[in-house]
Regions:
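Short glycine-rich or small-residue beta-strand-to-loop segments that form or flank ligand, phosphate
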Residues: 48, 71-74
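Short helix-loop-beta junction
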Residues: 64-72
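Short acidic/polar active-site loop segments enriched in Thr and Asp
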Residues: 98
Length: 195
């Protein structure tokens, strides 16, 4: 993973922003009216973040980025479905974004709810369905079940994206696309890259 960090300028830019955030040395880049004006002709974000809808994990804040920098897809439990894959494919294939980060986080309430086997209301059983593979992978592991499911889900979602995104396998083979699993620690603000 260190090799990717060293060689990937976009990932380095993300992680440097996260370091500033952790140290409370935010520079709030690209948030001026000039930047807004500059973007009226189009967007060229340098990274895609697939993250959870949790109010404590807003990518622009935790990576200290601004307008037009990040293409963000947020959904409870950072799971995948067809529209989410389509959203990511749009950014890769039409906006030429070459880095995808799949970011889970500590204390994910959505995963917790699924692990507790609560009778879930409304459309929430579809979340359980989306997390089922991670739940199966993690259920016999030692340690905290919720944390294990969060980690398993990030890995499985990254793998699924690698395999199912249109043109993603060949792009990755040619080094034109990088998909990075990551885990955000709510208490410290650190984004940890997972291998
Ligand atoms: Zn969450």
């Amino acid at each position: 993973m260190n090799k990717i960090v060293v060689n990937n300028a976009n990932l380095r830019k993300l992680m440097e922003g996260n370091k500033r955030y952790m140290a409370s040395h935010l520079i709030h880049p690209d948030q001026s009216s000039e930047r807004r004006f500059e973007l009226k002709h189009g967007q060229h974000p340098f990274a895609i973040i697939l993250g959870c809808s949790d109010s404590r994990v807003p990518p622009e804040v935790i990576f200290d980025q601004g307008l037009g920098d990040l293409y963000v897809v947020r959904v409870v439990g950072n799971v995948l479905d067809q529209m989410i894959v389509a959203s990511i494919e749009y950014a890769v294939l039409h906006l030429d974004v070459r880095l995808i980060m799949v970011m889970g986080h500590s204390q994910c309430g959505a995963v917790q709810a699924t692990c507790n086997h609560n009778q879930l209301e409304g459309h929430l059983p579809s979340l359980t369905f989306a997390l089922n593979a991670a739940l199966n992978k993690a259920k016999d592991l030692p340690g905290d079940l919720t944390e294990n499911v969060i980690l398993a889900n990030v890995g499985l979602v990254s793998e699924e994206l690698k395999q199912t995104g249109a043109h993603f396998p060949e792009m990755m083979k040619k080094g034109e696309l990088v998909i990075v699993p990551a885990y955000y620690h709510i208490d410290t603000g650190k984004v940890e890259l997972l291998t």
